[in-house]
Amino acid sequence: MISGIRVNDNCVTEFNNMKIRKTCGWIIFVIQNCEIIIHSKGASTTLTELVQSIDKNNEIQCAYVVFDAVSKIHFFMYARESSNSRDRMTYASSKQAILKKIEGVNVLTSVIESAQDVADLK
C-alpha cells in the first residue's frame, strides 16, 4: 500500500463470489476517497463489449477491471487516453494493493485505453 490507498473488504468478497460462485462476469473497481471500491459489476459479456461500455461511460476515467473469461480471470487497469496523469499515477501505484487482496487472477494486462487495445490483444 505504497500509495496510501486501501482496498475495501467488499472488493475481495465480490471478487471471490465471481471467481467461485460465478455471481457475475466482471467487476469494475475505482478509487474514491483513498479507497478502492466497486463501481459496478455485471453479467457475462465479451471483453471487447465490456471495454466499449466503459469507453462510453464518461464518468470513468481510470479503473481496475476483472473479467471472468470462463477458464481464466483477466485483470487490467483501464485508463482513458484523455485521463490526467495524476489519476494514472495513482492507479498505477495502487495496483499492487488490489492484486495482493484478490487471488486467482490468471491474465494480467498492464493498461488498456480503449476497446481497440482489446482487439490488439487477440
Curated annotation (Swiss-Prot):
Disulfide bond is among the record's keywords: no
Stored Gene3D superfamilies: Severin
A matching Pfam family: Cofilin_ADF
InterPro entries: ADF-H, ADF-H/Gelsolin-like_dom_sf, ADF/Cofilin
Localization (cell): Cytoplasm; Cytoplasm, Cytoskeleton
Main location per the UniProt record: cytoplasm
Disulfide-bond pairs as recorded: none
Recorded superkingdom: Eukaryota
Gene Ontology process terms (BP): actin cytoskeleton organization; actin filament depolymerization; cytoplasmic actin-based contraction involved in cell motility
ADF-H domain residues: 4-122
Keywords, alphabetical: Actin-binding, Cytoplasm, Cytoskeleton
Segment forming the signal sequence: none
GO cellular component: actin cytoskeleton; cytoplasm
GO molecular function: actin monomer binding
Keyword DNA-binding: no
Physiological role: Not involved in actin polymerisation, instead functions to stimulate nucleotide exchange on monomeric actin and influence turnover of the small amount of cytosolic actin microfilaments. Essential for erythrocytic schizogony.
Assembly and oligomerization: Interacts with monomeric actin, does not bind to actin polymers.
Family: Belongs to the actin-binding proteins ADF family.
Protein name: Cofilin/actin-depolymerizing factor homolog 1
